[in-house]
Regions:
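AMP-binding/adenylate-forming catalytic core of the ANL superfamily
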Residues: 1-74
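Conserved C-terminal "lid"/linker of ANL adenylate-forming enzymes
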Residues: 31-36, 45, 66-114
Length: 114
């Protein structure tokens, strides 16, 4: 069962949300996390960029991701993006993102959100 973000207006499932944003050419991968108490979480999409993409491109990429999300019913409410230098992963399964660790990081960096 995938991870879920439970907001005041509904539940978002990572396996339905992340593929929508992962199509962006500058994005290596994304991870949906929730900030706050379950049932009232704020959805935040953590973004890991492809190698060589400059930090100065983050504002443009966030705008483009926002536009991509608006084209889908289940991603239209996601408008907060945080850029992470390299997602934490489970040491036993290198591809498995450490979402709990990432959610704590996102909560600490929430003030960086536009």
């Amino acid at each position: 069962k995938g991870h879920r973000v439970v907001t005041a207006t509904g539940t978002l499932c990572t396996e339905q949300v992340e593929p929508v944003f992962n199509v962006h050419a500058d994005v290596r991968r994304t991870a949906l996390v929730g900030i706050g108490a379950k049932g009232a979480q704020t959805p935040v999409l953590c973004v890991e960029l492809e190698a060589g993409v400059a930090k100065t491109e983050q504002a443009r990429i966030a705008d483009e991701l926002r536009h991509i999300g608006e084209g889908h019913v289940h991603t239209g409410r996601i408008d907060r993006f945080l850029f992470h230098p390299g997602f934490p992963v489970d040491i036993r399964h290198n591809a498995k993102i450490g979402r709990e660790t990432l959610a704590v990081w996102a909560a600490r960096h929430a003030q960086d959100l536009p």
